[in-house]
Curated annotation (Swiss-Prot):
Entry's localization field: Cytoplasm
GO biological process: tRNA N1-guanine methylation
Catalytic activity: guanosine(37) in tRNA + S-adenosyl-L-methionine = N(1)-methylguanosine(37) in tRNA + S-adenosyl-L-homocysteine + H(+)
Gene: trmD
InterPro entries: Alpha/beta_knot_MTases, tRNA_m1G_MeTrfase_C_sf, tRNA_m1G_MeTrfase_TrmD, tRNA_m1G_MTases_N, tRNA_MeTrfase_TRMD/TRM10
Alphabetized Gene3D superfamilies for the sequence: 3.40.1280.10, tRNA(m1g37)methyltransferase, domain 2
Record-given protein name: tRNA (guanine-N(1)-)-methyltransferase
Top-rank lineage group of the source organism: Bacteria
Keyword annotations: Cytoplasm, Methyltransferase, S-adenosyl-L-methionine, Transferase, tRNA processing
Length: 231
């Protein structure tokens, strides 16, 4: 997979991509990253990326021309262009899985008041992290990249993916490490039993309880899917 990030702040992106799992994925040739500053595609000598909004209003609007020029240069027939904006669908684990199917992702990261509306005809999908506003789209881009890349086969252990949160709409089970007794708060005995069937059953039960307590929205989806399977 190739991922191209279009941004005005490329120095924000590279440190994360060149560390930890993202770096390992690059070294294993499982993903290729490209970070592009679309300011370089401005036609004027001042490299102007924003301007005042027609009709008035606060904030500056990102100009369409440099972004369109940049997209036309980097977009290929196999590209999928994702705009990172709070007006998009909320990003999820399922969304990340779908993104792994594309050979080339182009992530467009914004700033300021927003984009000139005329760029939207060049966009395939709009993604948001949630109903809140960030100063820019770089954090969103990195979140989308991390969640997507780690799902690419070979990046991390397959078993780790199966056990992670949001698999089957359940949060991950509680985990423990040494010491066994922390001021009277002890590790559940079943985890020390060596009985893998009992441990698996205990963990599944804890997943359900944890999801019901902390994410009732996910728990509702879990029950709906369970009932659907039992029909």
């Amino acid at each position: 997979m190739k991922i191209t990030v279009l941004t005005l702040f490329e120095n924000t992106i590279w440190p994360y991509l060149n560390s930890s799992i993202m770096l390992q994925a690059q070294k294993a040739n499982l993903v290729q990253f490209e970070v592009v500053n679309w300011r370089n595609f401005c036609n004027d000598k001042h490299k102007t990326v924003d301007d005042m909004a027609y009709g008035g209003g606060s904030g500056m609007v990102l100009k369409a021309e440099p972004i369109i020029n940049c997209l036309n240069f980097y977009k290929a027939p196999n590209s999928h262009v994702v705009l990172l904006s709070p007006e998009g669908e909320q990003f999820s684990q399922n969304c990340a899985k779908k993104l792994t199917k594309y050979e080339h992702l182009i992530l467009l990261s914004g700033h300021y008041e927003g984009f000139d509306q005329r760029i939207y005809k060049y966009i395939d999908q709009i993604v948001s992290l949630g109903d809140f506003v960030l100063s820019g789209g770089e954090l969103v881009a990195l979140s989308v990249i991390d969640a997507t890349v780690r799902l690419i086969k070979g990046v991390i252990n397959d078993q780790s993916l199966i056990c992670e949160s949001f698999n089957d709409n359940l949060l991950d089970f509680p985990v423990y490490t040494r010491p066994y007794d922390l001021k009277g708060d002890k590790v559940p005995e079943v985890l020390l039993s060596g009985d893998h069937q009992k441990i698996e059953s205990f963990r599944k039960e804890q997943q359900i309880l944890k999801t019901a307590k902390y994410r009732p929205d996910l728990y509702k989806k879990y029950l709906e899917n369970k009932n659907e399977k039992n029909k």
